[in-house]
From Swiss-Prot:
Involved in valine catabolism. The lineage of its organism: Eukaryota, Viridiplantae, Streptophyta, Embryophyta, Tracheophyta. CDD domains: crotonase-like. Belongs to the enoyl-CoA hydratase/isomerase family. This is Probable 3-hydroxyisobutyryl-CoA hydrolase 2. Pathway: Amino-acid degradation; L-valine degradation. One of its GO terms (molecular function) is 3-hydroxyisobutyryl-CoA hydrolase activity.
């Protein structure tokens, strides 16, 4: 597919509709896509004729995340700066979306994971449906929840964000609405009518657009097996200070009242990279006290260290096992939580030495930013 057709652009009066168009790849975000999206969003913000931007995905996914295999190939070929540039552009796009002066609506009628979650959750309106599947599966890939996840996961009720970020748990549309990851739930059968109403919008007034969305929104019941029904257990366990203490708390729950959900949660943690569990927990905890810009700057430092592989090579190994060879049997190093020391974790949060082009993330100038977006120096 020609790169220019990976993001389809449609104009409907004062509305711009951007559609991810890599359905066979579940709309995995290529470098061209994130670059094009950044260019378009910046242009639309300055164009007085554009009042609203709508994001959609072709096929059964909004976006399953970043297009990671090319980045892994770059790492293996020693072209780390190319991978860093991909994340730099992607995180800048996340920042622009989180500070955007015009309303944008993301229609999440399918899979929403990783980078796809960043594009939607950093925006103003997120529309889930009965087809929505949300996850941040990074710890199983040798990575950590990024794209601003340390900001938005840390602001979910209680310690639900730690649970979602560490386990990679999948949420449906009703759960997304309940925890705040989605702003509205609209049955997929109503999307055509909703979009037709949105395309008539001649205003950037957030309240006006919210009123349109409210008219089509429903409040679905949570599935009886939903993890959101277990907030008390999640808070007891995932509020612990360390990953080791989280494991111990879950194991105590199992001895007192064993059930399939607890066992599945422990199993998900056991499959994840020990290093990435520890840096993910710290990242989310730090995110509670930081603006979204600060979170993205820190996450960029972290992802650069992950790519360099000086501390651990789990990113390449995890992607090999899950995305490339697909044997789903990663050989993590270190293999045990107790072998991941505090000093190793600390290194992920330090500035990358200014060599070979490495430098901290810098955002384009933004005007009239809310306090949540302030990108203070770390």
């Amino acid at each position: 597919m020609a790169s220019h057709s990976q993001v389809l652009v449609e104009e409907k009066s004062s509305v711009r509709i951007l559609t991810f168009n890599r359905p066979k790849q579940l709309n995995a975000l290529s470098f061209h896509m994130v670059s094009r999206l950044l260019q378009l969003f910046l242009a639309y913000e300055e164009d007085p004729s554009v009042k609203l931007v709508v994001l959609k995905g072709q096929g059964r996914a909004f976006s399953a995340g970043g297009d990671i295999p090319p980045i892994v190939r770059d790492i293996l070929q020693g072209k780390l700066i190319r991978g860093a540039h991909y994340f730099k552009v992607g995180y800048t796009l996340n920042y622009v979306l989180s500070t955007y002066r015009k309303p944008q609506v993301s229609i999440l009628n399918g899979i929403v994971m990783g980078g796809g979650a960043g594009l939607s959750t950093n925006g103003r309106f997120r529309i889930a449906t009965e087809n929505t599947v949300f996850a941040m599966p990074e710890t199983a890939l040798g990575l950590f929840p990024d794209v601003g996840a340390s900001y938005f996961l840390s602001r979910l009720p209680g310690f639900f964000g730690e649970y979602v970020g560490l386990t990679g748990a999948r949420l449906d549309g009703a759960e997304m609405l309940a925890c705040g990851l989605a702003t509205h739930f609209v049955p997929s059968i109503s999307l055509t009518a909703l979009e037709a109403e949105l395309y008539k919008v001649g205003s950037s007034n957030q309240t006006f657009i919210s009123t349109i969305l409210d008219a089509y929104a429903e409040y679905p019941h949570l599935n009886q097996h939903s993890s959101y029904h277990r907030l008390d257990v999640i808070d007891r366990c995932f509020s612990k200070r360390t990953v080791e203490e989280i494991f111990s708390a879950l194991e105590r729950e199992v001895t007192q009242k064993p059930n399939d959900w607890l066992l599945a949660t422990i199993q998900a943690l056991e499959k994840a990279s020990p290093s990435c569990l520890k840096i993910s927990l710290r990242s989310i905890r730090e995110g509670r006290l930081q603006g979204v810009g600060q979170c993205l700057i820190r996450e960029y430092r972290m992802v650069c260290h992950v790519m360099k592989g000086d501390i651990s090579k789990d990113f390449v190994e995890g992607c090999r096992a899950v995305l490339i060879d697909k044997d789903r049997n990663p050989k993590w190093q270190p293999r045990r939580l107790e072998d991941v020391t505090d000093s190793m974790v600390d290194q992920y949060f330090e500035r990358v030495e200014d060599e070979e082009g490495w430098e901290d993330l810098k955002f384009p100038p933004r005007n009239n930013l809310p306090a949540l977006a302030i990108a203070a120096k770390l």
